[in-house]
Amino acid sequence: MADLDLQRKMVSPKLHVTIPEPCKLSSVSSPISSSSSAACSAYELYLRLPELRNLWSSLYFPHWISEPVLKPALQALEITFRLILTVASDTRPYINRREWIRRLDSLTTSQIKIVAAICGDEDNYEENVSAAPVSNGWSSLSLLSEIATCRTSESVGQKILSTIENEMRWCKYTLGLGEPNLAGKPYLQYDAVCLPEELHSLKNNPYADHIENQENQMLYTSHQILESWIYVSVNLLYRIESRIEEGKFEKASSDVYLLERIWKLLSEIEDLHILMDPEDFLKVKKQLQIKSTFPNDAFCFRSKGLVEMAKMSKELRQKVPAVLEVEVDPTGGPRLQEAAMKLYSRKTEYEKIHLLQGMQAVESAAKRFFFGYQKLVAAMIGNAEANANRTVANHESYDSLTQVFMEPPYYPSLDAAKTFLGEFWSQL
C-alpha cells in the first residue's frame, strides 16, 4: 500500500518540486585534467615517484588479496614516522613545533584507523586471513621504535603505540611495531610487507644537497605520504568496481566508505602546509621553481595519480544502473530515479542503500578536497598569485579547481529521487 501511495504522489498534480539549476561553467570537456607533461615529470622526479611506485607495486604474497591496498598504506604510515622525526630534530627556533606534533599525531591516528579498517575487512574472508603473512616477531626496521625512545618525540611515539593497540583490537593480527599486544595475537610481518629499509633509502629528494632549506624536506616528505595514499585509493577504486560487477554490494560499500575517509585524509595531509614558515616556504618555492606554466594550471593537477583518483571517483556514477539493476532510459526518462525511490522506501536491500550513500559521500569529500585546496594555496602563496591563474573575464568562466567543486551532482537520479521523496513526506 505504501508503494502504491508513493507512486500516486509521484504523479500527483499537487506535487510541486523546485530543483535548482546547476551553475553554468565554461565549456570544457572535463575540469579534471593533468598539467603539462613537463610539469608532471618534474613533480614525479622531485618526489622520486618512479622508485616509490616500484615499492608500492612489489607484491610478494600472491594469495593475500589485501596486499595491493595495505602495502602502500603501511608505507605511507612509515613515511609519516620519518616526518615526525624530521620535525622533532628541526633546529629552527621559530617553527610551531607543538602544533606540528599535534597535527602529525592526528594524521598518524587517521592513517592507523584506515589501516585497521583494511585489516578488519579481511575477517570476512577466512582464506584471506590465513594468507596474511604473520609471525611472532616485531619489526626491527620501522622508525616508530626510534620515535618512542627519542627524548623529543617519546610522548607521541608512546601514544601511537597505544593507538595501534586500540585500533587493531578487532583484527586477527596486529602490526608488530612494539604495541603491547595484550591479546597475544600474531604479528604482521611488517618489514617484509612495508620494506622500511628500501623506503627510507628514498628519504632525500634530488635537491637535498644544494637547497639548504628545511621546508624542502617537509614538502618532499608530506607529498610522498600524499602520493602513497593516492595509490591506495586507485587500487581501492578498482576493487570497488570489481565488487559491484560481482554483485558484492556490502563489500563494495565498505570500500566506498574507506575511499571517502582517504579523500578526507588527503585534506589533512595538505593542511600540513599551513604550518610551514611562510618565508622559508616561499623561498623553497622559488628554489624549486614551482610556478604555474599556463592559466588554470592548479598545482595539484601535476599529480597524475590524483587526477586519476578524481576521475575514477566521479566515474563510480556509471555503476548506479548495475546497483539498481535497471538500464538507463535512452529517452531520458526517470527510470533510474524511480528505481532509487523504490529502493529507498522498501529497505529490503539495505546494502545497496549503503553503497549508494557511500558513493555520494565520496563525491562530497572529493569536492571538499578541491575547495579546501584552492583556499590553502591562497593562504600559502597569497591571493594575488593564486588568483592570477584564474580566468575571471565573466561570471561564467572559472579556474579548473572551481569547476571541479561547482560541477552539477554526479548522481542526478539519486538527487532527484531524494528530492521527490522529501516532497512526498512533506505533503503528509
Swiss-Prot record:
GO function terms (MF aspect): heme binding; metal ion binding
Main location: cytoplasm
Domain of life: Eukaryota
GO cellular component terms given for this protein: cytoplasm
Keywords: Cytoplasm, Plant defense
Locations listed in the record: Cytoplasm
Keyword Cytoplasm: yes
BP term (GO), one: L-tryptophan catabolic process to kynurenine
Keyword Iron in record: no
Subunit description: Interacts with SNF4.
PANTHER family in UniProt: NEMATODE RESISTANCE PROTEIN-LIKE HSPRO1 (PTHR34795:SF1)
Role according to the record: Positive regulator of basal resistance.
Name of protein: Nematode resistance protein-like HSPRO1
Organism the protein comes from: Arabidopsis thaliana
Organism ancestry: Eukaryota, Viridiplantae, Streptophyta, Embryophyta, Tracheophyta
Gene that this sequence comes from: HSPRO1
